[in-house]
């Protein structure tokens, strides 16, 4: 693991009216590290990742990326710098195939008889390459995503992030609504990301998954950071106590 954080959150606060959604939160993420972000509903997890990814702007504090202070105007600017977010709904188009989803909004074009048309062959070929890097096997790249399992859909979302050279991947409840076998596949994918040097922020209510995949755990409660530890140095009982304030 690198000694230099790829992402630093420094004393970040965010208010919505009179509500402190985040209050003086700091944390670091290193390349090739899986950092779990734990907390109950309303703890501030979603607000924090939206500040990092450019959806919200912090009222106070700083975000540093590769050592430089950054302010992302919107999520697209964050993606252009290599920060990708996979939300629980995956933001995939069920009626499109794998290649079209990997290139969604960034479709390559070619000219046929002087007219611009989608280069579907390139999209499918490069999508296959991206999934192959993660050892993901999908037999039919020409089928719409609605025909695929939840685990395969999650894999396509991860493959899309890797294809666009993500250096930081934020994953919001990636194993929610999946069966146990598919949860295991997603955990294996996250471990593959770690091996490739991607820094992963892993948001989950599932402590079993957190302990299976993370290197460190940060716990939020009511907008404040109340705990941070190496995963191997704690247990689920301690994490739950931090979450509920016991």
Please place each PLM-identified region on the residue numbering.
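Glycine-rich phosphate-binding loops of nucleotide-dependent enzymes
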Residues: 2-246
């Amino acid at each position: 693991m690198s000694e230099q954080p790829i992402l630093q959150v420094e004393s970040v606060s965010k208010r919505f009216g009179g509500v402190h959604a985040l209050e003086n939160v700091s944390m670091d993420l290193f390349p090739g590290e899986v950092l779990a972000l734990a907390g109950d509903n309303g703890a501030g997890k979603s607000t924090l990742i939206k500040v990092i990814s450019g959806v919200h702007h912090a009222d106070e504090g700083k975000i540093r990326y590769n050592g430089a202070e950054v302010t992302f105007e919107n999520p697209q600017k964050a993606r252009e710098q290599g920060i990708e977010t996979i939300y629980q709904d995956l933001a995939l188009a069920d009626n499109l195939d794998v290649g079209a989803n990997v290139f969604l909004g960034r479709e390559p074009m070619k000219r046929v008889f002087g007219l611009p048309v989608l280069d579907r062959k390139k999209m499918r070929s490069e999508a296959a390459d991206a999934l192959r890097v993660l050892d993901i096997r999908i037999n039919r790249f020409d089928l719409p995503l609605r025909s695929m399992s939840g685990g395969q859909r999650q894999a396509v979302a991860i493959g899309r992030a890797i294809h666009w050279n993500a250096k930081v991947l934020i994953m919001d409840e990636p194993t929610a609504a999946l069966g146990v076998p598919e949860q295991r596949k997603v955990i294996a994918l996250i471990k593959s990301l770690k091996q490739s040097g991607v820094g992963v922020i892993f948001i989950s209510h599932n402590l079993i998954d957190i302990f299976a995949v993370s290197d460190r755990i940060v716990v939020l409660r009511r907008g404040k950071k109340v705990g941070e530890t190496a995963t191997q140095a704690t247990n689920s009982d301690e994490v739950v106590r931090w979450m509920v304030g016991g």
